[in-house]
Amino acid sequence: MTEQTNQNPAAAAAQTGPIVNPQAVYIKDCSFEAPNGPFVANTTGNPTVNLNIATRTAPLTQDVHEVVLQVNLEAKAGDKVVWLLELQQAGAFFIRGLAGNDLTHVVNIVAPNYLMGFARATVADLVVQGGFPPFLLPLVTFEALHARAQQQQAAAAAPASTVN
């Protein structure tokens, strides 16, 4: 036996609330370089790894937004580059029922957090396939990155003070 409900469409739509669903996760661009292979001369210990992470977003349609997590890594032993990795881990997210700060929160914080696990696995796999021990991306606080970006935008938009 099935249960029947007599709800009008407007009431049903009101109950669904905001919707956020990943539609696709993909590598938009990727590059791994090991200029000297895994046998870098005169290296002892672990290399120093410089990490830069950035995000960017763009609407693809009215309800679908692309979020790109850009990860750049450079491993160096002294002045020698051991390996370089550039990754653009992207996702298309269906987002409906959100606007303003809520939409900004999803595309700048929630979506990059979702993509980070995929990026972490890709980075570890590429480094291992390059002949090196795996590198695990650290936890990233996208809330702090977003807050810093907003502060920088506000500072750039503020009028410069003049001294007479």
Regions picked out by a protein language model, each given a short descriptive name:
Residues 2-114, 118-164:
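N-terminal intrinsically disordered, cationic/polar leader segments
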